[in-house]
Structure formats: C-alpha cells, structure tokens
C-alpha cells in the first residue's frame, strides 16, 4: 500500500492529543522510510519483476528488518518511546501511543495488499493477502482509506478544505501511475523515488495544515 497509509494519518489527527499531521505522515510510512536506505545500502533486497503481481512489479524478497511483524512491533515501540521522551504534558502518553499505532498500521495495511512476502519474524513465515493481484480493488482500497481518513480530518477543522482535497487527488494520481504506469528502472531508483515522495508529502501536509484551525495537540 502507498497513499492509503495516509488515511490513517488523517484519521489519527482528528483525535484528541494527536501529534501534528506531518509527523503522522512520517509515522505511517516509517517502515518504508527505513526500507529505502536499507535497500540502497544492501541490507534489504528487492528486484524488479514485471508481472509478479498485477499492479506492483517489486519482488520484495528480503526485508526482515523493516517489514517483518516483529520488526514492525519493535519500530513502533521505538517511535513511541522517542516521541514520549520529548517531554510530558497531559496528553503526552496518548500522543506517543498514537505515534506507535500509526507506525504499526503500516504493516497491517500492507498485509492486505502484499503477496505473501511479509515475514512474521526474521525472513520466515511470510504472509500477505495479495490484493495487488486485483488492481481495481487495490486501487479502490487506497482511495477509500485515503479519502475516508481525510473526511474525518476535514470534519474537525474550519480552515479551507479544497487545498487538502486537491492534495489527496494528486496523491491518488501518483498512486494510479505507480499501479498502471511503467515499472521503475531499477530497485535503487524505486527506493530513492519512494523516499523523496515521503519527505515531500510530509512537507506539503505541514504547509497545508497551517491554514486549518483544529484542536491543538496538548502533548509536549
């Protein structure tokens, strides 16, 4: 899954004591944010195999440090602890828990779309429901989760809604290109492109949220 992950960010931002939207954007993609440099460094492995699924050409054959269930739980705990260490406040624990759950949500949503390439631990017992092999349904799920979360978010703010909706539309167009466009030229190019997208999306989210009046996070 790609842009659907951001639906979790939008929904979580609606909750009391939630961290800023840009931070939630990073949290829901943290496993992939780590995956990209791990691939570039040769720690995790991926290759381009057109047709391996009907909508994603990436053969993610070795990624135990970012996308095993055990690793996802550990990275969630690390993110929770790091956010909690930044200070106290009446909502600090709740905000830290949201960050941790946002990180873990990545694995849960990936489980739905991936073929069985997500290990439960180390590089063994790989699982995945394989919705990527049904591109129309996979794309519909991405759109539904993204805009469902955004609807919750926009329902709790009084700023301009159109810019955020347009942002979501652009993200969905990028998702369509990922699904139905040509495959990446290399595994390294895929990793770099993904990492740039995560940073740019988080930056845009931070910029757009400045115009929204929503309950301010009370966590430190």
Regions found by a protein language model. Give the residues of each.
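N-terminal membrane-targeting hydrophobic helices
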Residues: 1-220
């Amino acid at each position: 899954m790609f842009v659907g992950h951001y639906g979790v960010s939008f929904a979580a931002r609606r909750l009391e004591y939630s961290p800023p939207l840009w931070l939630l954007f990073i949290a829901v993609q943290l496993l992939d944010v780590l995956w990209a440099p791990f691939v570039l460094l040769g720690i995790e492995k991926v290759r381009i195999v057109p047709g391996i699924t009907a909508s994603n050409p990436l053969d993610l054959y070795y990624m135990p440090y970012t996308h095993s269930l055990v690793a996802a739980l550990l990275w969630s705990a690390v993110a929770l602890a790091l956010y909690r260490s930044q200070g106290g406040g009446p909502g600090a624990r709740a905000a830290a828990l949201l960050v941790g759950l946002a990180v873990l949500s990545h694995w849960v949503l990936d489980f739905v779309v991936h073929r069985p390439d997500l290990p439960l631990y180390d590089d063994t017992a790989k699982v995945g429901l394989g919705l990527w092999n049904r591109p129309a349904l996979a794309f519909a799920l991405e759109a539904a989760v993204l805009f469902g979360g955004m609807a919750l978010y926009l329902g709790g703010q009084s700023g301009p809604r159109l810019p955020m909706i347009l942002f979501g539309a652009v993200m969905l167009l990028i998702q369509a290109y990922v699904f139905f466009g040509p495959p990446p030229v290399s595994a390294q190019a895929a990793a770099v492109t993904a990492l740039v997208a995560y940073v740019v999306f988080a930056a845009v989210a931070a910029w757009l949220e400045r115009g929204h009046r929503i309950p301010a996070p009370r966590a430190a």
